[in-house]
Amino acid sequence: MAWQVSLLELEDWLQCPICLEVFKESLMLQCGHSYCKGCLVSLSYHLDTKVRCPMCWQVVDGSSSLPNVSLAWVIEALRLPGDPEPKVCVHHRNPLSLFCEKDQELICGLCGLLGSHQHHPVTPVSTVCSRMKEELAALFSELKQEQKKVDELIAKLVKNRTRIVNESDVFSWVIRREFQELRHPVDEEKARCLEGIGGHTRGLVASLDMQLEQAQGTRERLAQAECVLEQFGNEDHHEFIWKFHSMASR
């Protein structure tokens, strides 16, 4: 018989219904549903009494829960070498698989089911990470647009500076030629005019140089911000969400 199962379907089958992470020390209740041992303990505090299954609500004997060996074998067979251990909740020691939209923090399944985040809107970490990556891409696009504007401003300032310097050279040449035709009595007037045009030019050039320096500084800061955003995109889901949320709150 041929079997065809998608990766998403397989991932759903291997997830604990409580913590929404891959089973760890899976136990099967008498009703047939399986959960992480840690999740069942957190739910009922111990397994020596009756346990109400969170899926079918059937009350079963917790002490009769047996390890789901077949499921553990499947998970172990599919686990990649060197897979990092997931970050866990400090309260329940379960994987941080959810993101509380109200409190803007990472939580585990039990935090959302029974803890302080009960009834809060929550989203799977992978979905939040995808959403934040989209926001990061939009921010990156805005950054590129700002860089383009700064580059255009710098090009315009450089062009204006060159034009003013060239025009100043032409005016100076015209003035020199005109004054060469005059006699000595007008030499002082010639010098005064040249100094005037020179001072005016220096003032304009100094102003443009200052604007150029400011624009180039802005471009460098935008480039640094671009580098930081690119580095955020390479972080793992949890580090990325923590750092992105920290940056956005500022």
From Swiss-Prot:
Belongs to the TRIM/RBCC family. PROSITE patterns: ZF_BBOX (PS50119), ZF_RING_1 (PS00518), ZF_RING_2 (PS50089). GO terms for cellular component: cytoplasm; cytosol. This is Tripartite motif-containing protein 74. CDD domains: Bbox2_TRIM50-like. A zinc finger (B box-type) spans 84-125. It holds the Pfam family zf-RING_UBOX. A zinc finger (RING-type) spans 16-57. GO terms for molecular function: ubiquitin protein ligase activity; zinc ion binding. The keyword Kinase does not apply. Zn(2+) binds at residues 89, 92, 111, 117. One of its GO terms (biological process) is innate immune response. Keywords: Coiled coil, Metal-binding, Zinc, Zinc-finger. Residues 125-169, 204-235 form a coiled coil.
